[in-house]
């Protein structure tokens, strides 16, 4: 079995994590929002997408690990996908600060 890390459990990351979990992978999902983590751990959908409401794994589901800590998750993962927001700035350029922060956190958590 392979372990997949998903950094960012929003409208892209959460369904991606669920899809990999349903395919048999162990999931290490990470989000900076404690509220999001608490909801996903409770089997609830924090995204607002009604298509996800009935597919979030229930509490205690095997191979489903959800945390706010990238440092906790990454050492368990064979691959890490970053699915964080890239909002548009006032001058219509992508704000990559979330991607950069997630990338740094993943890099720092990789076992040396």
Go through each PLM region and give its residues:
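Structural/interface elements that position substrates and couple domains in central-metabolism enzymes
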Residues: 1-112
